[in-house]
From Swiss-Prot:
Calcium listed as a keyword: no
Catalytically driven reaction(s): tRNA(Leu) + L-leucine + ATP = L-leucyl-tRNA(Leu) + AMP + diphosphate
Principal cellular location given in the protein's record: cytoplasm
Domain of life assignment: Bacteria
Keywords per UniProt: Aminoacyl-tRNA synthetase, ATP-binding, Cytoplasm, Ligase, Nucleotide-binding, Protein biosynthesis
Organism: Chlamydia felis (strain Fe/C-56) (Chlamydophila felis)
Protein name: Leucine--tRNA ligase
Motif ('KMSKS' region) on chain: 601-605
GO molecular function, one term: aminoacyl-tRNA deacylase activity
Classification via PANTHER family: LEUCINE--TRNA LIGASE, MITOCHONDRIAL (PTHR43740:SF2), LEUCYL-TRNA SYNTHETASE (PTHR43740)
Keyword field contains Aminoacyl-tRNA synthetase: yes
EC number: 6.1.1.4
Gene3D superfamilies in the cross-refs: HUPs, Isoleucyl-tRNA Synthetase, Domain 1, Valyl/Leucyl/Isoleucyl-tRNA synthetase, editing domain
Annotated motif 'HIGH' region, positions: 40-51
Length: 820
């Protein structure tokens, strides 16, 4: 029999679909396991093999847990709102819905070809009205709890894209999407009050089985700092409040720096300095916050011409404006202590400001006694507490906790996003839509370009925007901003628990059964924002009594990047691998230009993506799945090599030939059972530990040992086929039936490992005739002498035929020698 994956894989994919083999059920008599991928944005480029690493890992776990008797939820859906589809609509006039649906169909086809065991009945897209009806409802929950509000904000506005961008979507003054110029402008926006949950989001990290670097990134993003708020008197009447985490260095202050957007900055500018300062502020407004706080940026600033009084020494402290200070953190004013802060030192040296040493090399306070302020000799927490107590007594400050985390700018000036379900009235009030008014659908439009600054495409459709509100009998105006792509992905994991519910986003019963997500796998690029936003929404739901767990994701794994060889003409761009060739050790393009050859992240832009469909057609999905794991540890970067897929295909060919061999018999063989039980034990342990890259090697080692047997015990191979099923499910299903079992290997369960077989109880006897090696036999260690001699005579019978055996030499567990 010949192994033909093109026939086998199609056959079993149709079987699984017909029998709904992976439908998840809430079974009270089974433990549950919820394994989830970070669902993809369905781009026009489709999937490359780099995307499949995480999907293959979750599928292996899902199939393994089903076999172990768990009720498994393993769904897939589509994060389908987003800017690329809208930009394509602007260029072509094609409705984003059409583009998105076409892309989803392509993604679905690619994933299906891999044999992933998704519960297809739970699939949805965030752009489905049946889904975003509930996204709108959940936004209104935030609104009702005072966690969604409108405010005038300095935003990153991209005229070319016609929308506001988050700080993470801007780099070096340009949009990451398209590389267009970005400006800072004031705009009235919807904001989510994520800062209300700062402490809960911090504390919740402690109990999570997440990579420590991800938890640290979130801690840093939230940025909790304990310190003091210090008041510096300005113009003998007003105070400028400064937050510091190091009040013990207060006497080392030689300047103050205020953020350009601080509301009091205008009052601090001396008239003879106004033109220069305002010009600087104007320039600062064109920069993104990321660019402003970059460590590598040369410090810039301008003196306001105004001084503040030091609260301890009474010295005049110059007030400067600099764009490295951000209004949203602390008070928007920092005290410059250049002797003990590297950033302050750079600023002081740039502008020739004084530097005062107030800590010795061991951190003890020096040069800090002034009148009744006696700080010298104190250290660390004791020194800080002394300063705070002194300031409180003099009404010049108090202790304070500050956070870097700022409220979440939520609205976007786009068409392809969830409409925000709010009606505004002329008197400044607004009304949230009621349940019977949801989902609020966007109007059908022909022109997807923005209306102008602060107005998305929806603002053009006057008949949709301007309405008579029947609920209040008033003239109103619909909100024309839409939600960001983050909105739909903040809660999708909950919808999968109850995807067909038309009465609520999920039922309490099903949420309680499935949550939390037991294993969540996705890219490290989502380490902060998606995970933080999802945790925030989940905490709100928890406080509202809507979910049973305070945290959504129990265990998180970030899969590593998949690298592939890229070829680039310096100064021009990338070329396809098929347009590159090596000539005397130098890589050249077909146009005759020398190439830079690198190992880079697989991506469409670098022309080094590998289409999985091509590999499936050549080698089969099972070989691709196996190599996807064999290529390296799940959480590490790995270099892709198509030859590795070919190697896995050769292994599967060999395994297929082994199981279908005429040597397979219904016998009990200790060595064969030992090899099978040892393999199953190893594979189970490796899946539990997520050491998936070592599994293919274990199977290869098994085959190399197993083929040495004279007869292949069928029961041992049945165990091994079941153990292979999570990794290579199609060939396993086929071989399972060839061995005489009913279809549906998942239902057969995970093979039980008998501890007695984990120790190799067989030994290899050397069988000699007149001292010459004639055979080797694997025989049980416990076999009696006569049993061994009987087996040995049978093995070398042709050498003994018609001969007289004069002597039988027997060495236990080692040797039999027949002397003629």
């Amino acid at each position: 029999m010949r192994y033909d994956p093109s026939l086998i894989e199609k056959k079993w994919q149709e079987f699984w679909k017909e029998h709904k083999s992976f439908k998840a059920n809430e079974a009270d008599d089974k433990p549950k396991y919820y394994v989830l991928d970070m669902f993809p944005y369905p781009s026009g480029a489709g999937l490359h093999v780099g995307h499949l690493i995480g999907y293959t890992a979750t599928d292996i776990v899902a199939r393994y847990k089903r076999a172990k008797g768990f009720s498994v939820l393993h769904p897939m859906g589509w994060d389908s709102f987003g800017l690329p589809a809208e930009q394509y609509a602007v260029r072509t006039g094609t409705h984003p819905r059409e583009t998105t649906q076409k892309n989803i169909e392509n993604f679905r086809k690619q994933l299906s070809a891999m044999g992933f065991s998704y519960d297809e009945g739970r699939e949805f897209a965030t752009s489905d009205p049946e889904y975003y009806r509930w996204t709108q409802k959940l936004f209104l929950l935030l609104y009702e709890k005072g966690l969604a509000y409108m405010a005038d904000m300095a935003v990153n506005y991209c005229p070319e894209l016609g929308t506001v961008l988050s700080n993470e979507e801007v780099e070096n003054g340009l949009s990451i999407e398209g590389g267009y110029p970005v400006e800072r402008r004031m705009l009235r926006q919807w904001i989510l009050r994520i800062t209300a949950y700062s402490d809960q989001l911090l504390e919740g990290l402690e109990g999570l089985d997440w990579p420590e670097n991800v938890k640290q990134l979130q801690r840093n993003w939230i940025g909790k700092s304990e310190g003091a708020l210090v008041r510096f008197k300005v113009n003998n009447q007003n105070f400028l409040e400064v937050f510091t985490t190091r009040p013990d260095t207060l006497c080392g202050v030689s300047f103050l720096v205020i953020a350009p957007e601080h509301p009091e900055v205008g009052q601090l500018i001396a008239e003879d300095r106004r033109e220069e300062v305002e010009a600087y502020i104007c320039r600062a407004q064109s920069k993104s916050e990321r660019d402003r706080i970059s460590e590598s940026k040369i410090k810039s600033g301008v003196f306001t011409g105004t001084y503040a009084k030091h609260p301890i020494t009474g010295a005049d402290i110059p007030i400067w404006v600099s764009d490295y200070v951000i209004l949203g953190y602390g008070s928007g004013v920092v005290m410059g202590v250049p002797a003990h802060d590297e950033r302050d030192r750079e600023f002081a040296e740039t502008f020739s400001l004084p530097i005062y040493e107030v800590l010795d090399t061991d951190g003890y306070c020096i040069h800090s006694n002034h009148g009744d302020f006696l700080l010298d000799g104190l250290w660390g927490r004791e020194a800080q507490d002394y300063v705070i107590a002194y300031l409180q007594k003099k009404n010049l400050g108090e202790s304070k906790v500050a956070y870097k985390l700022r409220d979440w700018l939520f609205s976007r000036q786009r068409y392809w996003g969830e409409p925000i379900p709010i009606i505004h009235f002329e008197d400044g009030t607004c009304r949230p839509l009621e349940d019977d008014e949801l989902p609020l659908l966007p109007p059908e439009i022909q022109d997807y370009r923005p209306e102008g600054f602060g107005q998305g495409p929806l603002a053009k459709v006057k008949e949709w925007v301007d309405i008579h509100d029947k609920k209040t009998n008033r003239q109103g105006r619909r909100e024309t901003h839409t939600m960001p792509q983050w909105a739909g992905s903040c809660w999708y994991y909950l919808r999968f628990c109850d995807a067909l519910n038309s009465q609520a986003p999920w039922s309490n019963e099903k949420e309680k059964y499935w949550m939390p997500v037991d294993l969540y796998i996705g890219g490290a690029e989502h380490a902060v924002l998606h995970l933080l936003y999802s945790r925030f929404w989940h905490r709100v739901f928890y406080d509202a009594g809507m979910v049973s767990t305070p945290e959504p994701f129990k265990k998180l794994i970030n899969q590593g990047l998949v690298l592939a060889t890229s070829y680039r003409i310096p100064g021009k761009g990338y070329v396809y691998p098929e347009d590159a060739h090596e000539d005397n050790g130098v890589w050249m393009s077909t146009s005759g230009e020398e190439l830079e050859v690198r190992q880079e992240k697989m991506s469409k832009s670098k022309l080094n993506g590998v289409d999985p469909q091509i590999l499936i057609e050549e080698f089969g999905a099972d070989a691709l799945r196996m190599y996807a794991m064999f290529s390296g540890p799940l959480d590490k970067n790995k270099l892709w090599c198509n030859q590795g897929v070919s190697g896995c295909r050769r292994f599967l060919n060999r395994f297929y030939e082994l199981v279908t061999s005429s040597l397979v018999q219904d016998i009990d063989d200790p060595k064969g059972m030992y090899l099978a039980h040892r393999l199953v034990h190893r594979v189970g342990e490796d899946i539990e530990k997520m050491s998936l890259n070592t599994i293919p090697s274990s199977f290869m080692e098994f085959i190399n040992e197993f083929v040495k047997l004279d007869i292949y015990p069928k029961s041992a191979l049945a165990m091994v086929v079941r153990a292979l099923a999570p990794i290579a499910p199609h060939i396993s299903e086929e071989l399972w039936t060839i061995l005489g079992n009913a279809p549906g290997i998942d239902q057969a369960g995970w093979p039980e490992v008998d501890p007695k077989y984990l120790e190799d109880t067989s030994v290899t006897f050397v069988i000699q005739v007149n001292g010459k090696l004639r055979a080797r036999l694997d025989i049980s260690k416990n076999a009696a002498r006569e049993e061994v001699l009987s087996l040995a005579r049978e093995a070398v019978s042709r050498y003994l035929e018609d001969k007289e055996v004069k002597k039988e030499i027997f060495v236990p567990n080692r040797l039999v020698n027949f002397v003629l």
